[in-house]
Amino acid sequence: MQSQKIRIRLKAFDHKLLDQSTKEIVETARRTGAKVAGPIPLPTRINRYTVLRSPHVDKKSREQFEVRTHKRMLDILEPTQQTVDQLMKLDLSAGVDVEIKLSAV
């Protein structure tokens, strides 16, 4: 397991929740003896939606809404079996999407 790398990508709408989950993952990985590269903030994706305020007339009167998707990336270098076990047991917030890729270095 020494020549492998774990890449973790996190996505959430709330950046505070995302930073808290990232901090928990980094602390867990460092506590088990693995090296951590990151967290690297990735570009925030902003989806904007424009809707008419009125259902009938007044085309010029519109309202805009936006959804921001914040992203972070972590690389765990030289993970041990204990690191993988602890990361599997980690209970993260429900609003955070976690994507994990395991690759050889």
Curated annotation (Swiss-Prot):
GO annotation, biological process: translation
Superkingdom as given in the UniProt entry: Bacteria
Keywords noted in UniProt: Ribonucleoprotein, Ribosomal protein
GO cellular component terms listed in the entry, alphabetical order: ribonucleoprotein complex; ribosome
One protein family per Pfam: Ribosomal_S10
Listed SMART domains: Ribosomal_S10
Keyword Ribosomal protein belongs to the record: yes
Gene Ontology terms for molecular function: structural constituent of ribosome; tRNA binding
Role summary: Involved in the binding of tRNA to the ribosomes.
Record's subunit section: Part of the 30S ribosomal subunit.
Family per similarity comment: Belongs to the universal ribosomal protein uS10 family.
Protein name: Small ribosomal subunit protein uS10
Biological source species: Bdellovibrio bacteriovorus (strain ATCC 15356 / DSM 50701 / NCIMB 9529 / HD100)
Gene that this polypeptide is encoded by: rpsJ
